[in-house]
UniProtKB/Swiss-Prot annotation:
Pfam families: GreA_GreB (PF01272), GreA_GreB_N (PF03449). GO terms for molecular function: DNA binding; RNA polymerase binding. It comes from the Bacteria. Belongs to the GreA/GreB family. InterPro entries: GreA/GreB_C_sf, TF_GreA/GreB_CS, Tscrpt_elong_fac_GreA, Tscrpt_elong_fac_GreA/B, Tscrpt_elong_fac_GreA/B_C, Tscrpt_elong_fac_GreA/B_fam, Tscrpt_elong_fac_GreA/B_N, Tscrpt_elong_fac_GreA/B_N_sf. Keywords: Coiled coil, DNA-binding, Transcription, Transcription regulation. The lineage of its organism: Bacteria, Pseudomonadati, Campylobacterota, Epsilonproteobacteria, Campylobacterales. Necessary for efficient RNA polymerase transcription elongation past template-encoded arresting sites. The arresting sites in DNA have the property of trapping a certain fraction of elongating RNA polymerases that pass through, resulting in locked ternary complexes. Cleavage of the nascent transcript by cleavage factors such as GreA or GreB allows the resumption of elongation from the new 3'terminus. GreA releases sequences of 2 to 3 nucleotides. This is Transcription elongation factor GreA. Residues 45-65 form a coiled coil.
């Protein structure tokens, strides 16, 4: 099984979520099912069916998080030099056509949120920018077309997913 890179911040966030699901949500839903079961006929018991559905969701998420965490290689971006774009780097690129400047941070796939500037290590843009330094220009081939970018800055910035 190939290990997937993830920042220490994303790893800790997923661990907290898994702990919450196992120690709080799972026991709570078991109680809710027992209470709903006590209300009689299970065929027409909406509370019972809603609780069972929630239990399925919780168990599926626990399994998903456990699987993700088991194949994670934790990387602390603070320990990496950020002279060139790499995993955990924050960088600014300028669209050479519009002169609009974008700031992105390269993170693991489960952490990615492009709307907040977190792009997956495996995304087409990240793959084309890995190894680039300020001043480099690329013609990025993306799913929605090609964009010419210039790398303006590469640096480390503490990541927060909250």
């Amino acid at each position: 099984m190939q290990k997937e890179p993830m920042t220490i911040y994303g790893y800790e966030k997923l661990q907290r979520e898994l702990k919450e699901l196992k120690e709080v949500e799972r026991p709570q839903i078991v109680k809710e099912i027992d209470i709903a079961r006590g209300h009689g006929d299970l065929k027409e018991n909406a509370e019972y069916h809603a609780a069972k559905e929630r239990q399925l969701f919780i168990e599926a998420r626990i399994n998903e998080l456990s699987e993700i965490l088991s194949r994670t290689q934790v990387v602390d971006p603070a320990t990496i030099t950020h002279e060139k774009i790499s995993f955990g780097s924050t960088f600014k690129v300028m669209d050479l056509d519009t002169e609009f400047v974008y700031e992105y941070t390269i993170v693991g796939a489960p952490e990615s949120n492009p709307d907040r500037g977190f792009i997956s290590f495996y995304s087409p843009l990240a793959r084309q920018l890995i190894g680039k330094v300020p001043g480099d220009e690329i013609n990025a081939k993306l799913p929605n077309g090609e964009i010419d970018y210039e790398v303006l800055e590469v640096y480390y910035k503490e990541i927060s997913f909250e």
